[in-house]
Each structure stands twice: as structure tokens, then as C-alpha cells.
């Protein structure tokens, strides 16, 4: 059989040649693989979540967690978030804390595996991209996101982006200042961070 006959048979049967899938972009890690958060601001973890307002429009939520203190350091609630938006938020958090993290742990999302993020991190922050399909390697922020989903997003319907920002911000404040963690000696993250001697 030649290729013309094969094409004719495919066409008669209404079949199509499968399109090649685009390969997922993978970030290039610049930090050592075995990174431990043995003090505040050593390792920050970043991850995204999605929700919708009642009109069906998407909400994108980014959270930045200090892996040692478990504090939610910052984040954004927007309709869309680019790598440049995330860089602005990371700069804001670093300015507020007076330092950048040694390592930023994240997945391979397009906002994180972009050229702008690599340029921003070069020389000042090590990037540690977890392997695709292994979210447990970013466990602290995944655990945080699970609580955010169960205790905030699943029990609230957001009428607007502004309402979502306020409700999520209030939840994050409560998480930082009132939620006790057994791994922190049953202290809330903010109190533990204020008394932490691991510098």
C-alpha cells in the first residue's frame, strides 16, 4: 500500500492523524537536589491553585511559604498571573523580610519555568524545580494548599475578585497567627518565626 491509498482510507473513515503533543517545559534547577530548610528564609516554596467566581471566571492563587517557619509569606489572587507578576511579588516579600531566600522550590509551571524567572534568580536565588508528577517533593506548600482548599475555597463562593482577595487574605492571616503546628512546638507560624533562633 502506498501513502496515497492510506490517506484516502483514513479520509473515508473520518480519521485524523494524531497531533504531536507539545513537550512540557521543564525548569532548570540551579540549587542542589538535597535542600533542607534548616532556618528561616533558607527555602521558600511556591505553588498555584485555581478557583472560580460565581460567574465562572477563573481565579489564580499563588502562595509563598517559608518551609522552616511554615509561614505564608505572601501571595496573589488574580485572574491571571505571569512570571513577571510573580517576580514582583517575590521582590515585595523579600523587601518586607529584608532578604531573599537561598532556594526557591517550585514545580514546572509556565510562570516558574520561564526565562524571566531564570534571569531574576541568577546569582541571587537558587531555583529547585521538583520533577513533573511528584508534588510530594513540594510537600509544605502542597499541605498549605490542601488546607486552603478545604477550609477556605471549598466553603466560600466568591462573587468578585475583590471578595476572593479579602477572604483568602483573612484566611492566610488566621493561618499565620492562630493555627498551631505540632512541628513548631504547637505554636502558630508567626509566633515561631518571631522566636526562632535558627538564623
Per-region residue spans from a language model:
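Charged DNA-binding/catalytic regions of mobile-element recombinases
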Residues: 1-199
